[in-house]
Amino acid sequence: MQFEVKDLINKIKKDGLEEAERISNDIIFKAKKEAEEIVARAEEAVGALKAKSEKEINDYKRHALEASRQAIRDLIIGVEKNLKSLFENTLKDNVAEVFSDNDFLSELIIKITDSWIKEEKLVIQLNESDFSGLEQILRLKLGNKLKEGIEIKPFKGISKGFKIQKKNTGLQYDFSVETIADILFDYLNPRFKEVIKVV
């Protein structure tokens, strides 16, 4: 009987050890499986986070580059506008300077009226500030033509220069600083654009 008890104890020990080993192996297997799943999920999350970060970095770079390009375009357009405005103002100043010379203006008016007086009566409109000085010069140089149908009048709407109106047709020709400068600017503008063309 003693052997039977010993055998029974040995058997219980053996069965207990086997069961404990089996349970231990199951626990280790499940732990490894769970660890592998956790690592796989972590790697997947890291990959997704890395892809998202790379996309955000690329988007930021693209937006920054687009913003830089737009800023450069705006700067170029601003510089072109400023240069154009400066050129236009300088042109107007130069025309105004030329038109400040009463001798030049009187010669110009006489040349224009010489060809038009044959067709119809004319009204020469001068700016008010230059009227008295220019009227005297024109009266001397035009002489009898004033009796033939040329009338000289002051006009508030002209800063420098003059306007000539054909009485019969009502047509008016504007030789003011602003109009002459605008015509010259329109003529010179394509060349000017070519000179300042940056991009």
From Swiss-Prot:
Presence of keyword Signal: no
InterPro entries assigned: ATPase_V1_Esu
Keyword annotations of the record: ATP synthesis, Hydrogen ion transport, Ion transport, Transport
A molecular function (GO) term: proton-transporting ATP synthase activity, rotational mechanism
Keyword Ion transport found: yes
GO terms (BP aspect): proton motive force-driven plasma membrane ATP synthesis
Function: Produces ATP from ADP in the presence of a proton gradient across the membrane.
Name of the protein: V-type ATP synthase subunit E
Organism expressing this protein natively: Borrelia garinii subsp. bavariensis (strain ATCC BAA-2496 / DSM 23469 / PBi)
